[in-house]
């Protein structure tokens, strides 16, 4: 996965099959997501769609949000890619890593709809962050225990963190047993036995319950995602100067009315 975490969406290069078959290459980069109602006007304004040339294709991607190139090809539908981009902007921090872990260790994905189903059910994936005491304690080089440990060690620390019997045994006497215990090997055994898949910041419970890749149709995912995305955009949209001026004027008028009313009431007392 590229360095960009793609929570701001991603860029695709859109071309037109009709012009391409006529020997003319027309394609333009487009940033997703965009409001669905603005897609066709955008395509027309960039000369990519007209009455005789309506079918578009994706000629390139500026990086892929996940390591599953088989679902990102020239036949990807722009409306579906747009919904996927919306899904990414709505994800909580950390969910991108969980989804990638599920892609790496779960069932192979063949279609964009399956990926969107995975994203839609991100909170149901059997993927868990490493979590143990002192994981964020820094050493003299300002690296945390999480950063300097292997995934195998981080998994062992996580699984054993709340095992009081284990730690009582390891810390018995002067704690020599603790220095002899191989946490890295503990994690390796779990991997070799097929129990887990290990990543940099999280692990996959291979025996856990996995969400279905065809749980929701594109229409279901699209309808809910677009509504949520539009709501988020409306909340984040800054007020226009005219709206601010109108609100200030209304507030001033209200304050003046309250002041006059207050004076009148005071005179009656």
Question: Model-derived features: where do they sit?
Answer:
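Structured domain cores in non-transmembrane regions
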Residues: 37-117
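Extracytoplasmic/secretory-pathway segments with low complexity and glycosylation-like composition
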Residues: 112-164
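Short, surface-exposed beta-strand/loop "edge" segments at domain boundaries and coil↔beta transitions
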Residues: 19-24, 64-68, 210-213
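Non-Sec secretion/translocation targeting segments of pathogen effectors
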Residues: 182, 237-269
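Ordered hydrophobic segments in well-structured contexts
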Residues: 9-15, 27-31, 55-60, 195-206
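Conserved NAD+-utilizing ADP-ribose enzyme module
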Residues: 128-130, 149, 153-154, 199, ...
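N-terminal ordered "arm"
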Residues: 2-52
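Glycine-rich, aromatic-bearing surface loops/beta-hairpins
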Residues: 161, 166, 170-234
């Amino acid at each position: 996965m590229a360095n960009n975490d793609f929570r701001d969406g991603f860029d695709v290069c859109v071309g037109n099959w009709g012009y391409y078959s006529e020997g003319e290459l027309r394609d333009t980069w487009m940033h997703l997501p965009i409001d669905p109602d603005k897609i066709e006007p955008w395509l027309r304004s960039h000369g990519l769609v007209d009455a005789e040339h309506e079918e578009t294709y994706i000629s390139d991607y500026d990086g892929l949000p996940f390591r599953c190139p088989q679902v990102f090809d020239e036949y990807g539908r722009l409306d579906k890619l747009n919904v996927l981009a919306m899904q990414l902007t709505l994800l909580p921090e950390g969910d991108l890593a969980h989804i990638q872990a599920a892609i790496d260790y779960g069932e192979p994905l063949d279609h964009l709809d399956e990926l969107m189903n995975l994203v839609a059910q991100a909170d149901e994936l059997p993927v868990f962050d490493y979590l143990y005491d002192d994981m964020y304690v820094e050493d003299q080089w300002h690296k945390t225990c999480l950063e300097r440990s292997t995934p195998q060690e981080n998994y062992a620390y996580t699984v054993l963190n709340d095992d009081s019997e284990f730690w009582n045994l390891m810390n018995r006497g002067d704690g020599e047993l603790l220095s002899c215990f191989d946490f890295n090997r503990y994690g390796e055994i779990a991997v070799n036995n097929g129990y887990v898949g290990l990543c940099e910041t999280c692990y996959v419970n291979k025996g856990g319950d996995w969400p279905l890749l065809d749980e929701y149709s594109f229409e279901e995912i699209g309808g809910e995602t677009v509504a949520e995305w539009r709501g988020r955009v409306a909340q984040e949209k800054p007020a226009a100067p005219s709206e601010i001026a109108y609100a200030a004027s209304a507030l001033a008028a209200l304050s003046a009315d309250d002041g006059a009313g207050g004076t009148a009431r005071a005179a009656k007392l």
